[in-house]
Curated annotation (Swiss-Prot):
Pfam families with a match to the protein in the record: ATE_C, ATE_N
Protein name, UniProt field: Aspartate/glutamate leucyltransferase
Class in the EC hierarchy, top level: transferase
GO molecular function: arginyl-tRNA--protein transferase activity; leucyl-tRNA--protein transferase activity
Family in the record: Belongs to the R-transferase family. Bpt subfamily.
InterPro entries reported for this sequence: Acyl_CoA_acyltransferase (IPR016181), Asp_Glu_LeuTrfase (IPR017138), N-end_Aminoacyl_Trfase (IPR030700), N-end_Aminoacyl_Trfase_C (IPR007472), N-end_Aminoacyl_Trfase_N (IPR007471)
Reactions that this protein is recorded to catalyse: N-terminal L-glutamyl-[protein] + L-leucyl-tRNA(Leu) = N-terminal L-leucyl-L-glutamyl-[protein] + tRNA(Leu) + H(+); N-terminal L-aspartyl-[protein] + L-leucyl-tRNA(Leu) = N-terminal L-leucyl-L-aspartyl-[protein] + tRNA(Leu) + H(+)
UniProt entry keywords in alphabetical sequence: Acyltransferase, Cytoplasm, Transferase
Function comment: Functions in the N-end rule pathway of protein degradation where it conjugates Leu from its aminoacyl-tRNA to the N-termini of proteins containing an N-terminal aspartate or glutamate.
GO terms for cellular component: cytoplasm
Organism, as annotated: Methylorubrum extorquens (strain CM4 / NCIMB 13688) (Methylobacterium extorquens)
Compartments it resides in: Cytoplasm
Major site of localization recorded for this protein: cytoplasm
BP GO terms, sorted: ubiquitin-dependent protein catabolic process via the N-end rule pathway
Amino acid sequence: MTSHPRDTPQFYLTAPSPCPYLPGQEERKVFTHLVGRRARDLNEILTQGGFRRSQTIAYRPACETCRACVSVRVVVEDFAITGSQRRILQRNAELIGTPEPNRPASEQYALFRRYLDARHGDGGMVDMTVLDYAMMIEDSHVDTHLVVYRERGPDSAIHGRGVGAPVAVCLTDVLADGLSMVYSFYDPDEASRSLGTYMILDHIRRARALGLPYLYLGYWVDGSRKMDYKAKFKPQERLMPQGWVRVE
């Protein structure tokens, strides 16, 4: 039997399953485990090559007849905010996002459950238990943290933190060339605040403050209404067969 060192990545292919984005299509994924001493370096390389992280798994689409999933990353330094995006920032001026260790909490899970039930009731994550949520948040061998958004309080100017229950949460990886928004969720009763867009705008600001050139948004799927929002942050780069291509 051939043995493989723990630090040598092995890649696997999933069986076909229904595509969650395009009706009538099937999806397959290639994946590997992010474990061992080289997990962080491997995650950096794979993210730049179009992979996404979920817990200790890095994956990317490997569909036989479709190439609709396209990795996108915002060019932070050149990002041109639109009028509607500026209004979203103003609408959420009383929110404070605080970086916190990637530790799960009951108030996070309560918000996560409400978000799934309201926004993704027919999705693959809808049956996630509190244990599943805890694993999603803390099961990581790479540099990751939570950004937890709460309302501004009377003493927020002193301690720099919001108060009350979370309004929105983002699990964020820190890479050598950018931030990667792994998963985000928010209060579904606050839909008028466009909190998903707000978190992206806030992460663009965070990446710029850290001197990082990119914000990785995951996959954009042309023709999928679920993914349309990712095309609104420009300039951005999209990973094509010839490499990353800038889109203005």
